[in-house]
Amino acid sequence: ELQSQTYVAQLKRNRSKYQKDLAAKKKQVEALNREIERIIAASMRGKGTGKIKQPVDMKLDSEFSKNKGRLPWPADGPVVDHFGLHYHPVFKSVKLPFNNGVNIALPKDAPVKAVFDGVVKQIVVMPGYNKCVLVQHGNYFSFYCKRGSTAVKPGDKVKTGQIVGTVDTIDGMNQLHFQIWKGTTPQNPELWLR
């Protein structure tokens, strides 16, 4: 009986600590998403029309769109967190922050590759995510986060399969956080990758 009470008390403490950690993580996720939306919105402004004017970008947009379900994975590893809303595996009533992408478990320093031809729009450093690279493909964007080294810089043209950086250990985990956006709307990456 005493053992059960001790276990319940420990679970309650863990839940409280986890909820505090989760609140901090939620703030990081929200900050990351706001920054992505800001960068994308700025990239897409074209004389008030919201469309990109350069023909090269529109060609990339069309080619990217045609490759839905056929893009290569940015790294070789298992998906450990999927797109969307999920609940904590132990505390079933606790919602995790909405995931606008997928998290892929990888060894430290594993290479991260561009999923399609594009232009590096920006490299952002975000708390909890380290270095993040945003690549533009017309009206589409791919986002590679939780990275250690960076092999590209803003303005660089990248090719499908080109290494854009490596994965770093953050919060004790070696994971790539990967997102795909169409304009300012996040897409489920698993529907785009083969």
Question: Language-model features: where?
Answer:
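Short aromatic-glycine-enriched beta-strand elements
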Residues: 89-92, 97-100, 127-134, 174-176
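Conserved, short, structured surface segments that act as functional micro-motifs
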Residues: 133-136, 154-194
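Short glycine/threonine/proline-enriched tight-turn/helix- or strand-capping micro-motif at secondary-structure
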Residues: 53-67, 81-114, 182
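Zn2+-dependent peptidoglycan hydrolase active-site motif and core
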Residues: 114-149
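Alpha-helical oligomerization segments with coiled-coil/rod-like character
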Residues: 1-64
